[in-house]
Amino acid sequence: MYKSYSMELAGRTLTVDIGRVAKQANGAALMHYGDTTVLATATASKEPREGIDFFPLSVEYEEKMYAVGKIPGGFNKREGKASEHAILTSRVIDRPMRPLFPKDYRNDVTLVDMVMSVDPECNPEIPAMLGSSIATCISDIPFDGPCATTQVGLIDGEFIINPTLAQKDMSDLQLTVASTRDKVIMIEAGANEVPEAKMIEAIYKAHEVNQEIIKFIDKIVAECGKEKHTYQSCAVPEELFAAIKEIVPPEEMEVAVFSDDKQTRENNVAQVTEKLKEAFADKEEWLAVLGEAVYQYQKKTVRKMILKDHKRPDGRAIKQIRPLAAEVDIIPRVHGSAMFTRGQTQICTVTTLAPLAEAQRLDGLDEFETSKRYMHHYNFPSYSVGETKPSRGPGRREIGHGALAERALVPVLPSEEEFPYAIRTVSETFESNGSTSQASICASTMSLEAAGVPIKKPVAGISCGLVTGDTDDDYIVLTDIQGLEDFFGDMDFKVAGTHDGITAIQMDIKIHGLTRQIVEEAIARTKEAREYILTEVIEKCIPGPRPSVGAYAPKIIQIQIDPQKIGDVVGQRGKTINTIIERTGVKIDITDEGAVSICGVDAKSMEEAKKMIEIIATDFEQGQIFTGRVISIKEFGAFVEFAPGKEGMVHISKICKERINRVEDVLTLGDKVTVICLGKDKMGRMSFSIKDVPEEARK
């Protein structure tokens, strides 16, 4: 017999079935939220993985197309690699869970959330996030949970808890907050310039809901939870730390890590490591964990410098931003480019414009999101950190960073009506020493403006870090963290926005949560830094969007036709529209409402295509004059094509003012002629005349 538990959550019923399915996993919960069903499982290996110095956690959010009554596309007709949305959801599930596992745990842990049914009223991300927490809490896997997750929307100034898919589409805020019993442990947000005070209010609205969910989870764990298993700790032996300090005193390690140059610091630490290897040459068991021991020693040293001495590794003040530089148009012939440098972090972003037909098509579980006109892609090559690795395409980190920058910029993009382009920005990481995702937001803003994209306002991003002591009041918030402060600190709090509000947040931490005081201070600190970057760097580099797109960017003409004429313009099996495209070299996109976009580089070709479409879509009246081409000659006259798929007949008597015996004496195939419309003949064909064209129209 299985056990079932239910609670009301945001006006819908959340039901959790324990012991019903997947009983061979360490923990499993079949989650029902409305008609949305997600199977969440937690499984751990029986033995630790050898030779690693990290906790091997993997999270898989699996979207099954049968959940929305679809058969997957493609040749194989089955689910393939994870979609971008699935990867991003996996990361959101991972981030609040990871800090709650023991730091010295080395057993492989896999969390799988399989979406089996989707109710548009109940977002599957919610039961997936809660299911992972419940499955892990009731398992025998060591875990300091529970944690709970809630989403918040903002419509007409009112907060919506766990908004439906339709509500998310119209919301000014898409916020996800995870909490432990007392503290916030993860924040992810996309927002339409939401003020800082409103954002904090929304975060703690979600935190309140999370406390009710945690009580619900506690009840399940009390009745169904297994005893946590003991595990082999992989912590560095204390006697090794003591021996290291004898050879390399704390003052010497401080000197090694204190530098504003990343490579100098890394070389200093490498020399310390070599010194220790020589000293411990006869202690194989210590050599096996020496790398982790040196890492931990660096960490303790840096944290002590910051927390006790208020001294950062590169000598900056606690609120000081690294040196900034910005420039645009650094790459010729592309549609727009910009480079943003912050200390030893450097990003170049290139913008490409294309017709709306080239927008990315999405085939996922969200019926309200079928395409994406703005794409931001982030690349992180190994040379940016001085390493050698083969390039194997974007990983989860690159996809996550790209999505964060994309989310930050979407609120300021012009509408399709204002700017009928698909837009792609690609951020290339030239150099990395922390906060590359935020630098890519700054570079993308300038690149879009340089490309002539009329964004409403510039956007900048900055990240704050944190070092905590033994009590909640013992902490230091750091503005603009570099790589070392990210690795050894407790928080990476990224915030992007305009002068008027926040457009994106992503908060990752390595501790068990943040107090409200820290959250408020971090948000205030990022606002201060963001204002500085916008005013002193971005707006001085490029004051606003260029008045038009660049010389090498495609131009777009828009016209409106009667929707009932769309079939005439397209033609049978696309023959007419393809002929226009072949003749002019332009790209054409037509919406169901009759909005036609003509895209090309050559203005003359675009105008020619526009004329053709207007002629095809027009109901002809007597007296209209056209220019066409002779496509057929008969004894009784000639047929003239005046637009692809559109033709009319010129009777032999209407060719010349003088009488002629043979059409061929005057016209040949391919001749370009000007004709005037006489109406329709008895057979319903367009009837033209060449001889009746006014003299001024012939010129």
Segments (PLM) and residue ranges:
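Extended amphipathic alpha-helical scaffolds
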Residues: 1-45, 229-369, 554-568, 576, ...
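Conserved phosphate/anionic-ligand binding catalytic regions in large, soluble enzymes, centered on
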Residues: 27-29, 122-141, 328-351, 433-453, ...
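Long, basic N-terminal domains or extensions that often function
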Residues: 1-232
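Long, charged amphipathic helices and adjacent flexible linkers at domain junctions
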Residues: 231-241, 532-559, 607-627
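Flexible, glycine/charged-enriched surface loops at secondary-structure junctions
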Residues: 103-109, 144-146, 213-231, 263, ...
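Mobile "lid/hinge" segments at catalytic clefts and subdomain interfaces of large enzymes
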Residues: 140-257, 448-547
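Single-stranded RNA-binding regions, centering on S1/OB-family and related RNA-binding modules
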Residues: 552-556, 563-699
